[in-house]
Curated annotation (Swiss-Prot):
One of its GO terms (cellular component) is ribonucleoprotein complex. It comes from Lachnoclostridium phytofermentans (strain ATCC 700394 / DSM 18823 / ISDg) (Clostridium phytofermentans). The gene is rplT. Gene3D superfamilies: 6.10.160.10, Ribosomal protein L20. Belongs to the bacterial ribosomal protein bL20 family. Disulfide bonds: none annotated. InterPro entries: Ribosomal_bL20, RIBOSOMAL_L20_CS, Ribosomal_protein_bL20_C. Binds directly to 23S ribosomal RNA and is necessary for the in vitro assembly process of the 50S ribosomal subunit. It is not involved in the protein synthesizing functions of that subunit. One of its GO terms (molecular function) is rRNA binding. This is Large ribosomal subunit protein bL20. SUPFAM superfamilies: Ribosomal protein L20. Keywords: Ribonucleoprotein, Ribosomal protein, RNA-binding, rRNA-binding. GO terms for biological process: ribosomal large subunit assembly; translation.
Length: 118
């Protein structure tokens, strides 16, 4: 049986990596060995970035809720505790949306929280 060389597979693999490295500067987009390292690092950073994005958005929502709650005379922690006592289950993303886009609706929630705290 004839020996089968892996040239075609190697070429496909190299082209796949070089395609991912398109736009990188210098040897990073031209040479397979350097491009492979850069692509691996980029993919690792992209994976970490997708996890980081979730944390950053939660931080942003909390900051917005805190600012709006303080404008209505309540701290973030007391506001959230008041909502918990009132058995209002609205997630932080929606609370932040209310704080930014519907000040009156948010104020009503603050009043509900205040009444349960008192």
């Amino acid at each position: 049986m004839a020996r089968i060389k892996g040239g075609l597979n190697a070429k496909k693999k190299h082209n796949k990596v070089l395609k991912l490295a398109k736009g990188y500067r210098g040897a990073r987009s031209k040479q397979y060995r350097v491009a492979k390292q850069s692509v691996m690092r980029a993919l690792t950073s992209a994976f970490a970035g997708r996890k980081e994005r979730k944390r950053q958005f939660r931080q942003l929502w909390i900051a917005r809720i805190n600012a709006a709650a303080r404008m209505n005379g309540l701290s973030y922690s007391k506001f959230m505790y008041g909502l918990k006592l009132a058995e209002v289950s609205v997630n932080r993303k929606m609370l932040a949306e209310l704080a930014v886009n519907d000040a009156e609706g948010f104020k009503a929630l603050v009043e509900v929280a205040k009444s349960k705290l008192a």
